[in-house]
């Protein structure tokens, strides 16, 4: 049986973690990005399908390619973040299932139903984006996930001619706590949950 993580770890991952909009000028190394992926890849996905594909934008040139896709409210925070991750999903993720889920012909589940394939890819890549956020937090980084961007522009600018489609953006770095807003409330258990 697994042991519960420490209260300090819970604070780092959940209760004290914040969505950051301002960033310290501390770089995030490529090795750290590899460590993030090395952790997040172990998060569960249905039939181990692992549809997320990530582009880590960490250069000024990459940010300029991304700039036209950003909403006005997300522009400055993204241009100043050390890294912006484009979390995309592979519409043909099922081609990797013989490698990832060799227990049966899982590939055929999705080749026979394009709607199921798209729903599965989008849902599971969204879960993987959450794993990325928690991997960042576990390694001492802060994040700022965003859905306010022109997905079609990103797909055309970064994924043209491929099977990838963008899902969301996540800024990554070491947050400037002086630029945080007051913490917003969350729903109580009674407001959000039911017991049957």
Curated annotation (Swiss-Prot):
One of its GO terms (biological process) is nitrogen utilization. Its cofactor is FMN. Disulfide bonds: none annotated. Keywords: Flavoprotein, FMN, NAD, NADP, Oxidoreductase. It holds the Pfam family Nitroreductase. SUPFAM superfamilies: FMN-dependent nitroreductase-like (SSF55469). GO terms for molecular function: 3-hydroxypropionate dehydrogenase (NADP+) activity. InterPro entries: Nitroreductase, Nitroreductase-like, Nitroreductase_HadB/RutE, RutE-like. Its EC number is 1.1.1.298. Induction: Up-regulated by the nitrogen regulatory protein C (NtrC also called GlnG) and repressed by RutR. It catalyses: 3-hydroxypropanoate + NADP(+) = 3-oxopropanoate + NADPH + H(+). It is an enzyme of class 1 (oxidoreductase). PANTHER family: MALONIC SEMIALDEHYDE REDUCTASE RUTE-RELATED. NCBIfam families: PRK05365.1. May reduce toxic product malonic semialdehyde to 3-hydroxypropionic acid, which is excreted. Belongs to the nitroreductase family. HadB/RutE subfamily. This is Probable malonic semialdehyde reductase RutE. It comes from Escherichia coli O1:K1 / APEC. The lineage of its organism: Bacteria, Pseudomonadati, Pseudomonadota, Gammaproteobacteria, Enterobacterales.
